[in-house]
């Protein structure tokens, strides 16, 4: 019954998209769609795929994310403290390590990031390395999620972190190569897609529900905002480092080797 409900809800979500596309094609552009059977088959696959993906989220990703957060913050798992003593933020180091690892691994496997990095490499003519771009984005995502978990543990307001991150983004935008800035901002958006968002949301909600004094509504959300910002920072940082290395190679003075002095002539009167 739940499966049928999800299939029906997904169909209702896809129908407006299909109506807009076909409406513009036939009413505004007034041209027939080439290979219409393939297009319809593609829409059918999208419908089935999204429905099964949503089922997988409900059955696996959301429960596992919340379960990992609750297990890593369980008092039996954390270092023992005396009764009445407030737990130190460093006691949750396994939470930070898990957040960093899951953030990096899910980003590397993100289909939208793979597609964008390949396209960026093709358009740039090989100037942008697709794999290094994915690594830079993955590191940014990992740092953002780790910082988000630390914020939940500390209970600090989200706006402080967002303000500081945006200030850093603005400074980097002024000093980064202009060609990389649009790609850096797009990289922050493509990371928060089908794979990463469910795990991040489940981890944040589970962590906020497991730590005493935290609210799932006030503290559980907000990790996705940091996950979007930090890939922008790391991609522009990667571009700045690459630019600095390139300038360093160009300005490195070439060693000039002086010619060896000619051999001295022997004394003619020596013999």
Curated annotation (Swiss-Prot):
Keywords per UniProt: Antiport, Cell membrane, Ion transport, Membrane, Potassium, Potassium transport, Sodium, Sodium transport, Transmembrane, Transmembrane helix, Transport
Function as written in the Swiss-Prot or TrEMBL entry: Part of a two-component antiporter that catalyzes the efflux of Na(+), Li(+) and K(+) in exchange for external protons. Shows a preference for Na(+), followed by K(+) and Li(+).
Record keyword Oxidoreductase present: no
Protein's name according to its UniProt entry: Na(+), Li(+), K(+)/H(+) antiporter subunit B
Entry annotated with the keyword tRNA processing: no
NCBIfam families xref list: NaLiK_antip_UmpB (NF041628)
Topology class, membrane: Multi-pass membrane protein
Annotated localization: Cell membrane
Subunit structure: Heterodimer composed of UmpA and UmpB.
UniProt pH dependence: Optimum pH is 9.0. Exhibits antiport activity at a wide pH range of 6.5 to 9.5.
GO terms for cellular component: plasma membrane
InterPro entries tied to this protein: NaLiK_antip_UmpB, UmpAB
Annotated stretches, region: Disordered: 252-271
GO biological process entries: potassium ion transport; sodium ion transport
Family from the record: Belongs to the UmpA/UmpB family.
Gene Ontology MF: a single term: antiporter activity
Transmembrane segments: 2-22, 36-56, 94-114, 130-150, 152-172, 193-213, 216-236
């Amino acid at each position: 019954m739940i499966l049928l409900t999800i299939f029906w809800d997904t169909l209702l979500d896809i129908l407006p998209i299909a109506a807009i596309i076909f409406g513009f094609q036939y009413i505004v552009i007034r041209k027939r769609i080439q290979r219409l059977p393939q297009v319809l088959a593609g829409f059918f696959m999208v419908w089935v795929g999204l429905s099964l993906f949503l089922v997988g989220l409900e059955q696996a990703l959301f429960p596992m994310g919340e379960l990992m957060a609750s297990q890593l913050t369980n008092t039996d798992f954390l270092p023992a403290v005396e009764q009445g003593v407030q737990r130190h933020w460093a006691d949750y180091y396994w939470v930070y390590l898990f957040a960093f690892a899951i953030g990096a691994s899910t980003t590397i496997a993100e289909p939208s990031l793979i597609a964008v990095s390949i396209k960026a490499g093709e358009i740039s003519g090989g100037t942008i390395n697709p794999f290094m771009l994915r690594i830079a984005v993955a590191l940014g995502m990992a740092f953002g999620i780790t910082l988000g978990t630390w914020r939940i543990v500390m209970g600090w307001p989200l706006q402080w972190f967002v303000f500081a991150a945006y200030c850093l983004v603005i400074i980097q935008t002024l000093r980064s190569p202009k060609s990389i800035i649009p790609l850096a901002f797009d990289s922050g958006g493509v990371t928060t897609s089908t794979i990463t968002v469910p795990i991040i949301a489940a981890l944040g909600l589970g962590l906020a529900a497991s730590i005493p004094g935290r609210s799932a509504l006030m503290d559980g959300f907000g990790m996705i905002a940091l996950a979007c910002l930090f890939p922008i920072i790391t991609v522009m940082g990667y571009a700045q480092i690459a630019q600095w290395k390139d300038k360093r190679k160009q300005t490195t003075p070439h060693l000039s080797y002086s010619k060896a002095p000619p051999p001295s002539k022997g004394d003619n009167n020596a013999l």
